[in-house]
């Protein structure tokens, strides 16, 4: 049987969105190392599997750009980080245009903060008809409680939570493809 469940990520229909991975946020974020490692894993997987990536930054003039740990692993096809002032990425015209240009219907979200920008973006994207997945171990907030509350709200609102590694294996689909060995090195 070749048909897969529609809630599984598919590399031909998925877009990776990396939200606000900037130093001022990460300086105070809960489990920064875990968060950064998992966002890197998703970005590297996207590069290997040719999955489009859109990154955002919140108020770059004041908060700066993406941290090097993330920018250095982005695929060359990734757009320059989109600067925004609104908390929901979906309210940015530039983000909406980038999303539409990809033609992708599944959105895999990661970044910060779970209960603010990630949640507002995810909820707006669900409202717009996208299937939204949030890698629960590739998002975080300043406290574990805020992260947990954000994830509960997302799940209750129709967003699909997953682990970053689970997302990677869904995007791979099988071990018998050429990219498998490259990605296996990332998860081992």
Provide a role label for each language-model segment.
Residues 2-15, 49, 61-188:
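Active-site-adjacent betaalpha module
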Residues 11-12, 28-57:
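A short alpha/beta connector and helix-capping loop motif
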Residues 17-19:
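Short hydrophobic beta-strand that contains or immediately precedes a catalytic carboxylate
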Residues 21, 58, 137:
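Active-site loop/turn elements of alpha/beta-hydrolase fold enzymes
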Residues 23-27:
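Short acidic, Gly/Ser-rich segments with clustered Asp/Glu that frequently serve as metal-coordination loops
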